[in-house]
Amino acid sequence: MIYESTRDINRKLNPSEAILQGLSEEGGLFVLRDLGKNKLDLEKLIGKSYYEVAEAVLHLFVDFSDEEIKKCVEEAYRGKFSHENITPLVGLKDSYVLELFNGPTSAFKDVGLSLLPQLTKTALTKVEDKNDILILTATSGDTGKAALEGFKDVDRTKIMVFYPNDGVSTVQKTQMQTQEGKNTKVCAIHGNFDDAQSGIKELFVDEEFKKELLSKNIKLSSANSINIGRLIPQVVYYVVSYLDLVHTNKIKLNDKVNFVVPTGNFGNILAGYYAEQIGLPVNKLVCASNNNNVLYDFLTTGVYDKNRDFLKTVSPSMDILISSNLERLLYYISGCDNAYIAKLMKDLKESGRFEVTGEVLDKIKDKFQAGFADDEQTKETIKAIYEKDNYLLDTHTAVAYKVLLDNLDNEHASIVLSTASPYKFTESVYSSLFETHGEDEFTLMNKLHEQTKVVIPENLRDLDKKEIRHKDVINKEDMKKYILEKLGDL
């Protein structure tokens, strides 16, 4: 089982090395060339627990022993999620909603970032690497807190998270600023998420920087979905949700379903593509964007162009113009053509745009659909679904639900991925339903609970009473300097 870089066929690593390194030296992402060679036996997995399905999926992507995989899964999830099924499926009138927000930070990132630290620890042991790992992560809001919580006080790891100072919700910012753990550091930057993510990627290919870290017995890795170890765990909930529908006789085994996915960085929906490649019967993967609809434009025209205004929306975790994981999809759709991917990514870096061939676009359209919703439509959808189904959506899930309603498919069951608790974006959710009078986010959190009776997640209840521990704000150009200065604190 060998991983290679999307941009260079000669850069090959085993699974443990790929998880630890995160990003290839020249900037490519690690992929399995023969993805789909081995398939899941779905019939055998019907009625199995989340843990058992996760073990079966991991076997297709890592070279760990049965015992190692089982231990990773158990330590990642047992007792850490508020629902025994980890990612429960809820039936509404038009579709099913896959609730991915029952983890320790109330966002879907918890699923991947609870397992990644366990995969990292196991990989360190397997490759007999004596260096510690520095996790560098950019976040548009949810990844940061989930990564901090996942890696908090994990032996031989240090983690630094960078977020756009004015580009996350009040709750998201407070979650990160109050983070505990002796190996954690959080810093805001003046700029947007793309600035933070680009800064991190540049450090991964900065040989001088990596040598300086190595002199301190430290190696770089990432908790973003550019790390294959973050992406693999997300494949599991696609499989689990499908098997749930089969087990409860909502569909028959081998019936195809649609998945509607709110996404900015393309990682969450790419996990659905991986699930389809290992045998899941998928009709369409529907990509739902907000007004930063660079992915919608690409999936409908074949032109990816980030040369546009960056818009702040009520779904800030999707306020992204550079969708990193699209590179992995293009690698597979192009027939694993590393040179072609290298050229596209060079075009993107130099001109801010690239265009794929008609053949590649047709292959993408065979499996993917796309839609988008603006802020007004998002808030209208929150109100409509609450009134119709007595179900409370967060802003990102509402984007996906609006796209679902615009593309209703009566022939196939549809599953909408719900990526966060509505309480992470309380002001936007509350004002979609009720009048506001200038209250702060935490006051509105309690008012939303009083009005809807939807339970506030335990990790958010007293968030405003926690001590602010991380107050640093820097210019985006100063990330490298900041990291080297603060390493000694971890």
Predicted regions mapped to residue ranges:
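PLP-dependent amino-acid enzyme catalytic core
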Residues: 1-490
